[in-house]
Amino acid sequence: MTPQSQFLVLAPVTPGRERDLRALLATMNSAPGMADPANAVLAFGQFERLHFARLAVLDDPTLSDEAYDLPRQSLPVYLALTGSCDGPADECISDLARRAGTGLRRIFAHCDGFDAGGDLAAWMQAHRGRLAANYINWVGRTVRQVKEEGALHRALAAKVSRALLASGAQAQELRRELIDFVDTEVSAGRLGLTPPDPTPVGWWIAKLLHLLWIPLVGLVLLPFLIVLSPLLIYLLRAKEESDAEICPPQDRAALLELQRLEDHDVSNQYTAIGSVKPGLFRRWLVSGLLVAVNYTARHVFTRGFLARVQTIHFAFWAFLDDKRRLVFTSNYDGGHEAYMDDFINKVAWGLNLSFSHGVGWPRTRWLVARGARIESKFKNYQRRHQLPTEVWYKAYPGLALADLKRNQRIREGLEPVRVTDAEAEAWLRLL
């Protein structure tokens, strides 16, 4: 099994160069916000292990929100390059620098402190943002597997009649014929069914250590948390009662720009940024909660679900500016409105845990109640904090997670030597 990883390369944009940068990024697209896989600047399609990638200018439109009687923050505009890949992120970044160095230098030339003649891979590694929490829908599912199983489905579907089968025996016979067909196509090189690579030993060791280490730290801290719980509860409720709500509707022009970049595929992108509420209490609380989110995403939600949500391919949270801001990105199936409704209806409490520490979030009660459940305020809030994703790449356009799961089941259905009539019929229905 090849594990997946994600990365964030982050650099401040040189003042006065943002407009030129956006113009360059626009030349990389074949549709609004949708990267041409073979574009002349950064041909994402040549990287066989890259699932998703994006380039986004993180220009926070909510920095001017006034709350807590604090002066307005003056923070940099960043350029973010993100990627979701097979194998270690370090290797993917090095591969990008080696094979697409010319285009990346053109892009990063708009950033402060970039040396066009220096070691690009080292510069990108030095500008990596640390991910606070990281979600992967199906650990071990590679780009190669997705593409091979997609081709398998198309080849088999073209061979199968849509007419109903008369009997289980007929289903068994058709299944055997299709297995013979696949064997012939694989032998001829027209289909590929590459077996998974061995899982790296280092990955298993790191996963086991993380599995044990985080609970041990929690056990050490537990007595202190119990002693301090009255104070912590008081602080939480006092802040929840007094925190400012800033949830006006999104500016219409900005909303139309976001919508212009959406629904060009069965999947969409989401990039959002916001300021963390001031004070050590909120900073420590959100840091601890994201450790918990990362732990469950790494050890519990690894097979198609994030809590009850099944439509997210990859997502991550990352702090910026010494934890004064938080950026969130995701790649999800379906439309934006359905995506938000899915979260509200299934895991509004999870939204509150992760995001209620942002300035202006709808007021929560006991950390998990209210907040995102107040639908109109939540939807206004998240749209105001969403940023245009200037360039977005998906390695397998037209395929949603439901398709990937179906195609995987089709491949797995080739393996058993004997199946029941009902199993043969169920497998054929997948085609």
Describe every region a protein language model picked out.
Residues 1-51, 59-62, 72-78, 84-87, ...:
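Short S/T/G/P-rich N-terminal loop/turn motif that feeds into the first structured element of a domain
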Residues 35-41, 86-121, 198, 204, ...:
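An amphipathic, aromatic/His-enriched active-site/gating alpha helix that lines ligand/cofactor pockets
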Residues 51-68, 73-98, 102-106, 306, ...:
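Elongated alpha-helical scaffolds
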